[in-house]
Amino acid sequence: MALDLLSSYAPGLVESLLTWKGAAGLAAAVALGYIIISNLPGRQVAKPSLLQVRTGGVAFEKVAEVVADYSDSYGQTEKGELIVKDNNKIVSLANTFYDLITDGYEWGWGSGFHFSHRLPGMSFNASQLLHESRMASFLRLKPGMQVLDVGCGVGNPGRTVAACSGAVVTGITINAYQIKRAELHTKRAGLVGYFKPVQGNFCAMPFQDKSFDAAFAMDSTCHAPKLEDVYSEVFRVLKPGAYFATYEWVSTKNYDSNNPEHVKCMNSIILGNGLPNIRSWKQAEEAGKNVGFNLLTSLDMATNSPIGKPWYSVPERMVNWGLFRFHKACIRTASTLHLLPPESWKFFYILAEMAENLVKGGQWDIFTPMHLLIFQKPE
């Protein structure tokens, strides 16, 4: 995580460190020093410190209980595939997940909670912004159009789309803490009036029928109990002829549910991201068509660039250098010393294992977080 922090400000330096044998030692010094000196008051900042992870959506003293409930929410099918025990708790599970992880994501990854290609000569942050800005092109946006960001998180994709198109973007997220973060970032970006976050369930949206000119979702609808649940709501609030573009987390044609290693990999991705399950790319296509959309484009963007570094290149480097193991040790130590909430290390262990399995899923080409679907509501 120390290298993630540095990467936000000096990605070139981090890439150099990752080719140097002393990277782990330097990371240790930076991380442990940062833990000690970062005990700041719980105020809103553009980028949370490590210790402010504890002051996100869960009170310090409640973390152990919340983490235990989170893990207990899952069971397994006869094939060993992970599923949520009670479908009625899927929405609250996603809310709990983002209570626990929002600060961590912002600290270690950035305010765009998604993956992207890394094109030659482009930094990580620039690649993320390029990935977000493509949505404006996919949707054929024009200034003043009313656009819906489905599952907006803390709002970086929505702000990017608004900034590069002049459209007015409304984002919806289930999580109250993410609304606070989104409002802060939007004010700092000077985009008040162009991006507005709204708290709500994207499977039961508080918007009028036919009220949006376009809609998009970026790595978010994977949290829906069923894709039809969220797709039908998007269909309802779109005007006739409007476009809906979404990046879906799906299994590819190479996934084999009878392969124990494939199942283990997917289970870790599900648990480590608060998902109900992982659908196939074909199921995602059919879900859109089932609610009335016309399917215009279906493309795995993870495989479309012959020169870009893969979406999993950042966690892959960290796995190759053993940095996730180092991170786990730092978090366990900080938790033991009560610099982080007791038992919080258990959740970070889940995340570290998930990151390693994201890399495997990408390397084995059984999973993609970048399957692009573009739908159109009939006129």
Swiss-Prot record:
Its EC number is 2.1.1.263. Keywords: Endoplasmic reticulum, Lipid biosynthesis, Lipid metabolism, Membrane, Methyltransferase, Microsome, S-adenosyl-L-methionine, Transferase, Transmembrane, Transmembrane helix. InterPro entries: Methyltransf_11 (IPR013216), MeTrfase_SMT (IPR030384), SAM-dependent_MTases_sf (IPR029063), Sterol_MeTrfase_C (IPR013705). It catalyses: C30 botryococcene + 2 S-adenosyl-L-methionine = 3,20-dimethyl-1,2,21,22-tetradehydro-2,3,20,21-tetrahydrobotryococcene + 2 S-adenosyl-L-homocysteine + 2 H(+). The keyword Membrane applies. The chain crosses the membrane at residues 17-37. GO terms for cellular component: endoplasmic reticulum; membrane. GO terms for molecular function: S-adenosylmethionine-dependent methyltransferase activity. The keyword Lipid biosynthesis applies. It is found in: Microsome membrane. GO terms for biological process: methylation; steroid biosynthetic process. It is a single-pass membrane protein. SUPFAM superfamilies: S-adenosyl-L-methionine-dependent methyltransferases (SSF53335). It holds the Pfam family Sterol_MT_C. This is Botryococcene C-methyltransferase. It comes from Botryococcus braunii.
